[in-house]
A protein has these predicted regions:
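Short glycine/serine/proline-enriched coil/turn segments at secondary-structure junctions
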Residues: 15, 66-68
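Amphipathic beta-strand/beta-sheet edge segments enriched in Tyr/Trp
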Residues: 70-80
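Compositionally biased P/S/T/G-rich terminal and signal peptide-adjacent segments
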Residues: 1-26
Length: 80
């Protein structure tokens, strides 16, 4: 499956999901609001990493915005 099949969620069911790893991504380019293009780019990077690790679900954590750079840690899972 491609990255369009990866779900961004706020929590997972430990009984239904297997932890596949995590990845930290960052995007340069300041955005005044978290819902801007930079966030979309960041989420796309997380979804791409999930596909590489055979995952289909990601949780975003440790989101930071500093000096025009946004970064986040994505936890990757394969869920049934």
């Amino acid at each position: 499956p491609g990255s369009e099949d990866v779900n961004l969620v706020t929590s997972i069911d430990q009984n239904q999901c297997e932890y596949k790893g995590e990845v930290k991504d960052k995007v340069k380019g300041y955005s005044d609001d978290f819902l801007g293009n930079s966030e979309e780019s960041l989420i796309q990077l997380g979804k791409n990493a999930a596909v590489e690790k055979n995952g289909n679900t990601i949780i975003i954590s440790q989101y930071r915005q500093y000096n025009g750079t946004q970064s986040a840690l994505f936890k990757i899972y394969a869920c049934r």
